């Protein structure tokens, strides 16, 4: 399993990337409610994914209310695809 990217393989980060892979962008509140995790947990995972170059963070204001949205980068999409391919290889491996 050494070929599985640990930044993706962590269950919560995998769920985040799966959600982002199906949309152009998602805001913090949507991810928070959908994943049912704490704000601190989500912030920590998003920071890790941003540092890996897998997500892009955009901070804006809607009126006076701050809004943070996230989208999958090209590198993030490619890494997620590579991750699935690695899982397929593991799944189809035959003993012996």
Protein language model regions, located:
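Residues in the helix-turn-helix
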Residues: 41
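Amphipathic alpha-helical dimerization/coiled-coil segments
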Residues: 1, 18, 74, 78-96
């Amino acid at each position: 399993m050494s070929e599985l990217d640990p930044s993706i393989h962590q269950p919560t980060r995998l769920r985040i990337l799966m959600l982002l892979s199906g949309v152009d962008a998602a805001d913090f509140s949507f991810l928070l409610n959908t994943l049912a995790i704490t704000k601190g947990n989500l912030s920590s995972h998003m920071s890790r994914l941003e540092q890996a170059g897998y997500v892009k963070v955009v901070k804006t204001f809607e009126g006076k209310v701050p809004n943070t949205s996230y989208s999958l980068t090209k590198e993030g999409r490619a890494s997620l695809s590579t991750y699935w391919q690695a899982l397929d290889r593991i799944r189809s491996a035959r003993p012996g």
